[in-house]
């Protein structure tokens, strides 16, 4: 029995619905799809993503500006500059954005420009960070640690809830295994269990679970079939040129096709894909791009 006083199903007589904006919520009968690149690389990139994914539709955009990388020599993200790009796209297209925070010092700035703050797998048990997020005033997307038990995952959410933030969404993103054919192993049993254990919404990240774009669609469908409230999927205008996690990124065309293919699966389990994103591509203001290379990288 998991001793989660606030996260447990017994604490609430309803399933929690977390609002990202006036039109977009996670939980309930409508499934939410969050899409976008692993890393924010340029304003032009994010404009392209936002305009094309509106047709899917995708209800929120993701994009990393602070990147926790295994190697200290890997690109660490655009930081404040990337955050400004997200803010511009969010404002111009009236679309919620999700991005990761890695430290307490980043919370205030990220919360000012993002609609949901993500806690990545590596920080799932960064307890001081979790406590601080209890006062962030924004919904939190909490990813499961790569070697964490279900109980540890739920208790990490409990830290955020117990420090004042009721808006927590859980994300199953795969756990480490002896088999390295896929990047991780997607634990769909955990999704079903979490839906019984807690009242919190649960979404799935099939991109990080498998690390191979050709396997993302089957696992996305399986996630919806087993009760997930939504998906967060990586996609890129030119996947092979992505500065991080290129192998798992879908093309924007494949992303749109995937969302369409999810509809009959959702219908089979009494759910439907939200149509909200179909209206977020408003008339963007003309933008003049500089010749600066994405991420400040040199050729």
Name the predicted role of every residue range.
Residues 278-283:
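Intrinsic, low-complexity polybasic segments
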Residues 1-34, 267-272, 287-289, 295-299:
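N-terminal amphipathic alpha-helix/helix-capping segment at the start of soluble metabolic enzymes
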Residues 75-99, 133-139, 188-202, 248-270:
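Alpha-helix-loop-beta-strand connector modules within alpha/beta enzyme cores
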Residues 136-237:
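Catalytic alpha/beta core domains of metabolic enzymes, predominantly
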Residues 78, 95-105, 115-127, 139-150, ...:
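Catalytic beta/alpha-barrel core
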Residues 31-46, 72-76, 96-100, 120-121, ...:
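Active-site mouth loops of central-metabolism enzymes
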Residues 62-81, 237-247:
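Glycine-rich, proline-tolerant flexible connector loops at the mouths of alpha/beta enzymes
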Residues 32-37, 59-63, 97-99, 117-119, ...:
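Hydrophobic faces of well-ordered beta-strands that scaffold small-molecule active sites
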């Amino acid at each position: 029995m998991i001793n989660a006083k606030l996260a447990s199903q017994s604490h609430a007589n309803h399933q929690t619905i977390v609002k990202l904006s006036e039109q977009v919520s996670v939980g309930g009968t409508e499934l939410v799809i969050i899409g976008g690149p692993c890393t924010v690389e340029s304003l032009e990139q994010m404009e392209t993503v936002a305009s094309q994914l509106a047709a899917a539709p995708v209800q929120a955009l993701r994009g990393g500006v602070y990147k926790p990388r295994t190697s200290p020599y890997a690109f660490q993200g655009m930081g404040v500059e990337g955050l400004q790009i997200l803010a511009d796209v969010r404002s111009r297209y009236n679309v919620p954005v999700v991005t990761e925070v890695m430290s307490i010092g980043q919370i205030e700035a990220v919360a000012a420009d993002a609609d949901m703050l993500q806690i990545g797998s590596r920080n799932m048990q960064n307890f001081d960070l979790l406590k601080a997020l209890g006062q962030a005033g924004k919904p939190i997307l909490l990813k499961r640690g790569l070697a964490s038990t279900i109980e540890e995952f739920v208790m990490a959410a409990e830290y955020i809830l117990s420090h004042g933030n009721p808006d927590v969404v859980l994300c199953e993103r795969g756990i480490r295994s002896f088999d390295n054919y896929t990047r991780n192993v997607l634990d769909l049993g955990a999704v079903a269990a979490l839906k019984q254990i807690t009242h919190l919404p649960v979404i799935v990240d099939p991109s990080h679970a498998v690390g191979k774009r050709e396997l993302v669609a089957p696992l996305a469908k399986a996630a919806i079939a087993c009760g997930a409230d939504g998906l967060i999927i990586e996609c890129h205008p030119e996947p092979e040129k992505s500065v991080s996690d290129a192998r798992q990124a879908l093309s924007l065309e494949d992303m749109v096709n995937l969302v369409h293919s999810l509809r009959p699966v959702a219908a089979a389990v009494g759910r439907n894909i939200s149509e909200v994103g179909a209206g977020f591509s408003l008339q963007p203001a003309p933008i003049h791009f500089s010749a600066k290379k994405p991420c400040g990288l040199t050729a």
